[in-house]
């Protein structure tokens, strides 16, 4: 193999990605819904302990809703199927707030597509071992997920929204 550890081998890496795509419908276990539901390194609300969140922004939204007696459920039992690359994928939203579905996303997940002039979601993480085709595949999947959100009337909260939360946003 020519590498100190088997996990460093390109062949082993590609087999692992192929296996994860079959089992979890993503390249790495850490991208799977199972991982995010069970991972240890989550954020927690000091004001309302009990839930573990994926980001400080999600904590902020949850605390705002609780502080203002707005019905809120984190990681609700809701999922939306979408197609990408000939496979059915599943999107699970962050919140059900007052009967509406919300997703919290950083601004760094979005860019303007130069050829269409439209905003799209893309993969902001780029690993050196990915080929250009692999990276573009990931970006395409992010945008397919974004289109799924739009098609299902999911409200996307971004930086400007998180920093200016109002009761009216959740009415």
What spans do the regions from the language model cover?
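Nucleic-acid endo/exonuclease domains
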Residues: 1-171
């Amino acid at each position: 193999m020519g590498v100190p550890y088997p996990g460093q081998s390109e062949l082993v890496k590609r087999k692992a990605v192929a296996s994860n795509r079959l089992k979890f419908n993503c390249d790495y276990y850490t991208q799977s819904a199972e991982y995010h539901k069970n991972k240890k390194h989550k954020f927690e609300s000091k004001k309302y302990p009990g839930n573990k969140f994926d980001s400080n922004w999600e904590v902020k939204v949850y605390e705002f809703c609780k502080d203002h007696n707005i019905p809120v459920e984190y990681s609700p039992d809701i999922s939306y199927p979408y197609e990408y690359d000939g496979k059915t994928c599943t999107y699970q939203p962050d919140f059900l707030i007052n009967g509406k579905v919300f997703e919290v996303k950083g601004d760094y997940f979005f860019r303007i597509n130069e050829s269409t002039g439209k905003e799209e979601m893309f993969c902001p993480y780029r690993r050196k071992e990915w080929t250009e085709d692999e990276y573009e595949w990931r970006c395409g999947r992010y945008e397919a997920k974004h289109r799924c959100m739009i098609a299902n009337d999911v409200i996307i909260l971004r930086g400007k929204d998180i920093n200016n939360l109002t009761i009216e946003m959740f009415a």
